[in-house]
């Protein structure tokens, strides 16, 4: 059985060591009774060491919001997987829509990052999702299949179980409301079908939903069979809000 998972991406909203410390010190105690749910945070890149120190000895996972496609070399401004390992981080966010749209990351580069993370035993949280709302399930599956085939063509089949897919339809990111619940379930089901068609064991892969997640929609979303958890954005900037989401997932999936 796949263990439920809730994560939060701080982007560049909570950027100082003091702010990050305040958030973590408030949040960690609120999660003590939810051992049936895995949690992780992608803090602002400048606060990774602070995060590592505060989360040492806890089950709260963390990692950077991006990483270089190579271990080392002339890659100015990138973040090496060697640094991730050195921090004892266990997750890395890869392929977020903002990385592709603002920084023009290519699919081939993202695929290399995924493979490198898996080879180095770091769990990649790989963001996938269509740019516009699909008209039907076939159109939705075809859009997702094109992405998955391009991103995962170089991984070993056994590595699939170490992948986390974050389904984030680009048209729902940062909006007032999430995608429709039945649409979300259709996308998650399609992703499992695609993994199976590529030879992976879809029953082992955790797929979480991200895009305007809140207390109001969390329970209905994670009640869906193929949804394993949630990827929270600005709603989780208040520690109690993040803890409430974890609680909802625990009650619904735990």
UniProtKB/Swiss-Prot annotation:
Induction: Repressed by GolR.
Reactions that this protein is recorded to catalyse: D-glyceraldehyde 3-phosphate = dihydroxyacetone phosphate
MF terms (GO), sorted A to Z: triose-phosphate isomerase activity
Signal peptide bounds: none
Pathway: Polyol metabolism; glycerol degradation
Keywords: Cytoplasm, Glycerol metabolism, Isomerase
Any one GO BP annotation for this protein: gluconeogenesis
Biological function: Involved in the glycerol metabolism. Catalyzes stereospecifically the conversion of dihydroxyacetone phosphate (DHAP) to D-glyceraldehyde-3-phosphate (G3P).
Protein name: Triosephosphate isomerase 2
